[in-house]
Each structure stands twice: as structure tokens, then as C-alpha cells.
Amino acid sequence: MKLFYNGTDIYNDVSLNYCVHEMYAEKQADTLVLRFNDTKGIWSKWNPADGDVLRFTEGASDTGKMFLHSMKPENGLFTIRAMAMPKSGATRKSKSWAGVRFLQLGNEIAANHGLTFQNYGCTDQVYPYLRQESETDFALFSRLCTLEGCQMLIYDGKLLAYSEQYIEQQAVAGTLEVDENGNFTYQDNRSACFGSCEVTAGSFSGTFSAPDAKNTAVLRAKCIAEAQLRAPGLPASGDRVVLMSNSNAEAARFAKGLLRNANKYGHTGQFSKALLTGYAAASLLQLKTEKASAWNGPVFVYKVRHDFVGNKSTLYFRDLLEGY
């Protein structure tokens, strides 16, 4: 194991009794929580500061660049919480754009926070008018990604936007074998999915219907928070900003994105086993389950939790959503 603090490996100089790294494919920044035995108050003497850079590596696992967000000395212990998102990402702003493009906005937001921007399959849509009103840059961009059937994540100093359908069409990165030595739980909530979505935003409206839909329920969401199924291990979106649209075509496109956001977590699972450092969020794996073969097939990993001190990993995954 290696723990870098502002570029220096301090692992052998500290007594680490808790180390959990959580990686997310969407809607939540990666977190790293470290707790040290510190009966002599050494950490406070080192004067750690918000924004300091940490990085933890173990085997094939690498947190990438993480920024210190909070610290807490308590009863001979010292706890640090770091995130992949820079501290500046919590700043609320207000701004408007005319004729801005999707990739232009991604590059602008990344630059605002000292990040670089990378795109994986997202269409460079144009927005005649876009408004940010007392919210963070990443909240705005995450909403826009969701409406376009995309998602964003931050890793190692990079803001990444990816089309979910594009990623789901790639080859699997490896195999996840669920055997008798691991604990697994699968959930089938597809009966709660929707057959179509209608978006009405001001004077514009649009509809999208899922191909070969087995459900007839219609989703009429006014915000992101109204277009989601609860996913194990993933916090529910609290985004209640009322949707805006510039045309009927844009409203129909947003309806497609919202329907995907609501339906993609209809079939989920999670698997825990001794530390599995070779797995990361936002990857495709081939699932093989010895005692539940009906669930076998390609899955999308939307969260990975590594407990390095407890020697345990938990992977959260969902089925691929076909057709949209």
C-alpha cells in the first residue's frame, strides 16, 4: 500500500486503521475516507489544509488525485475525507449562455476547477439558451448529461463525460465470477419501469417511447428527482430544478434521457468478496453466477467500494439498457 500526501508517500509513517475508497459512475464524486491512530496529535502539527492532494494505491487500485475536503481530530484519532472533486466544485454560481455547445460547456467547467475534459461518445448538442441559477457547475453539467442520456464523473484531475449507450456498446473489460465464497444480492424492479416519457417545459413538449416496452406507465417528470428508481448504494438525486427546453425536438430528446435515467436501474445486483482491486466504476463486466445463472450476462458497474483495511470489496452493477 502507498499513501501519497502532496506527492510524498507517508504510508509507513502513519498508523492507518480505516481506509475506504468509493468510486461512482454518476451523480456522486468519488470519496476516500482515512482514519489514523493519532494519540500524540501529530497530524494537527503537520497542519493539513483543505485542498491538499492525496492519492492511495494498492495493487491494481488507484484512487487518482483526491482533494482534502474535511478533517476531524477526536479521541486519539484523526479522520480525513477527500474527494475527486476539487473544493471549488462546491461553489454556487449564476450564469447564462446563448448558443453554447455541450462539449464547450464541459471544457469550460473543467477549466474553472483546474481539470481537463474528456468526452466518450457524447453528441455535441447546441443549446440556444442555458441558465445556471445559484447552483454548482457540476450540478448543472450532471443534469445536462442526464437529460442527454449521458453521465459525468471526475477522476485523477479529469472531468469525463460519457454517453451511457456508447459505453454499453463496448466490449466487456473482464469477468466477474460470483461463487460460494462471496455474498451477492440481486433485485428485479422492472415492474416499476416506464414505457414512455413526456416532457413539458414552458411552451414546448416532447415524448419518447421505449422500444418494445412491456410497461404502459407514462413518466411525466418536471425535474431529475422525479425520474429515477432507487439504486442500492447510490444516493437519490435531489435535483429539483424545473426543466427548461428551447424546442419540441429538445424536449423529446430530454424525454429519452429521462426515460433511460428512470429505467436503467430496474435490474441491479451487488457482490461482496475479499479485496478485488482490479475493478472500477463505469466499466462493463461479464457476470457469471454459479447459483443464479439466469442473471448471467454483461453488466455495467455503477459503484465500487474498497475497504482496504477490512480487506473487502463490494461491486454494485446493473443490466444494460437496450434500444435507447
Regions found by a protein language model. Name each.
Residues 69-77, 134, 165-167, 298-310:
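Short, compositionally biased
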Residues 44-56, 91-100, 283-288:
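Extended Gly/Ser/Thr-rich low-complexity repeat segments
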Residues 86-108, 118-143, 147, 168, ...:
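Short acidic/polar beta-strand-loop edge motifs in secreted extracellular
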Residues 29-31, 74-79, 156-160, 310-314:
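A generic structural signal for beta-strand entry/edge sites
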Residues 1-89:
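Assembly/oligomerization scaffold segments
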Residues 17-42, 47, 182-324:
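An acidic/polar, Gly/Ser/Thr-rich interaction patch typically located in mid-to-C-terminal regions
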Residues 78-94, 311-324:
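Short solvent-exposed strand/turn elements
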Residues 121-193:
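Short beta-strand-centered interaction patches in the first periplasmic/extracellular domains
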